[in-house]
Amino acid sequence: MFRISRFVRELNDPTPARPRRDPPGPVVIWNLIRRCNLTCKHCYSISADKDFPGELSTEEVFAVLDDLKALRVPALILSGGEPLLRPDIFEISRRAKDMGFYVGLSTNGTRIDAATIGDIATVGYDYVGISIDGLRETHDKFRRCPGAFEASMRGVRRCREHGLKVGLRFTMTDDNAAELPKILDLLDAEDIERFYFSHLNYAGRGNHNRRTDAAFGA
C-alpha cells in the first residue's frame, strides 16, 4: 500500500543511497531432455514418450556445467521434457550441486514415486517445481492422461514428506483461467508455500492457444 506520509518523510529526509552492486547472474532453465512420459496439449517443445536425436551426453553436460560456472551463472533449473527420464539426471544434479550451483528440478511430478524419491532427496534439490494446470479433470485433459493429477499431487506430498522445498507451477490459458481461485485453495489445503504463475509460451503444441488467449484478454 502506498502511504503519502512515508513519501513526505522520504522527501524531507532521503534514505542514503546504497552502494551499487553488480547485478546477479542469470538463472539458466536447462531443457536437458525432450522426451516426456506425457503429451500435454500445450507443450512448447512438442515432447513425446520417445527418444529424440541430438541430445547431450553426460560428459557433454558436464562440459556445459564448467562453462556455466566460468560465466558465473548462480542457478540452474533442470527441465525438459521430463528430466527424471534421463538415466543420468541424479549424476548431473549431484555434479551441479557439488560445483556450488543453486539447483532446481522442474518436473510434471508423475515420476516422483517410491523408486525415485530417495535419490531426489539425497541430491537435495534447492527447489522442486511441479506443474499443475488445473484441478483433476482439467489437469488430466491438459496432460491427455487420466490419473495425471493424482500422480503429480502424490509427487508433491512425497517431496514434502522428505523435507524438500516444493511448489506448484501454473501456466494460465483461456482453457484453465477460471480454475485459478481453486488452485489457490489447493495450495492452502495442501500447505504448499510456493507458487509459480506464468503465461503460456506460444510454441509447439501451445501455439494453437495464441488466438483464443488473445480473444480472452480482449
Enumerate the predicted regions with their spans.
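Radical SAM enzyme [4Fe-4S]-AdoMet core and its adjacent flexible, acidic
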Residues: M1, Y102, T122-V123, S131-D133, ...
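Conserved alpha-helical substructure of the radical SAM core
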Residues: F2-Y127
